């Protein structure tokens, strides 16, 4: 974890090179806290353009700005790719602390009724564990899910967790759920055109 007063987006490639050489945080999944959050999406699953999703455009840009290894290398997402995350605390691009950490793709999901990916946190992240992001076709609806297994990644987040980290994580999750719903439903409005 690195903390800055200035936006680091012009230095993302430098941060990417650093984090590509860092290890995934060790964890035992059975000892992590599990949470599943979901959002129904009013759009036919088969008509969704998943490009935004596989480019990690999940969180609103005032919360997390990211830099993905596969975009840096002009290709599609692969297992082992690193994502640099710049978190804005509070969620405002200008008037905030900029916290930099990273995650690594450990699974890509490409099933007929389920698309998504998962990543694990890299050393220095505020959490340790794994997050799974999927858009799924259930019996009658399309659902976006965020499924996490995590614990605080360092002493600071362990101490601040109940007061700050957990409420902020819930806030970010709600914003991500709404953001993906909005992006997909905009596709529907655009396709009706």
Question: Across the structure, where does each feature detected by a protein language model lie?
Answer:
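Hydrophobic ligand-binding cavity/cleft-lining segments
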Residues: 1-91
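Residues that cap or initiate secondary-structure elements
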Residues: 40-42, 91, 111, 125, ...
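Beta-strand/loop substructures that line and gate deep hydrophobic ligand-binding cavities in soluble
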Residues: 121-167
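A conserved amphipathic terminal alpha-helix motif
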Residues: 153-193
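Hydrophobic-ligand binding "helix-grip"
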Residues: 94-138
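A generic structural signal for short coil/turn motifs at secondary-structure boundaries
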Residues: 92-94, 156
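General beta-strand recognition
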Residues: 84, 116-118, 143-145
């Amino acid at each position: 974890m690195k903390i800055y007063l200035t936006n680091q987006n012009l230095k993302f490639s430098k941060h990417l090179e650093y984090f590509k050489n860092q290890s995934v945080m060790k964890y035992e999944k059975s000892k992590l806290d599990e949470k599943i959050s979901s959002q129904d999406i009013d759009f036919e699953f088969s008509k969704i353009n998943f490009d935004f999703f596989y480019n990690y455009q999940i969180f609103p840009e005032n919360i997390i700005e990211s830099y993905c290894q596969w975009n840096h290398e002009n290709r599609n997402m692969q297992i082992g790719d690193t994502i640099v995350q710049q978190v804005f605390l509070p969620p405002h691009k200008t008037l905030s602390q900029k916290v930099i950490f990273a995650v690594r793709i450990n699974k890509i999901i490409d099933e007929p009724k389920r698309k998504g990916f998962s990543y694990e946190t890299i050393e220095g992240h505020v959490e340790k564990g794994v997050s799974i992001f999927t858009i799924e076709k259930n019996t009658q609806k399309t659902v976006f899910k965020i499924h996490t297994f995590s614990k605080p990644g360092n002493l600071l987040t362990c101490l601040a967790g109940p007061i700050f980290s957990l409420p902020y994580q819930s806030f970010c999750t709600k914003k991500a759920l709404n953001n993906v719903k909005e992006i997909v439903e905009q596709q529907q409005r655009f396709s009706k055109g």
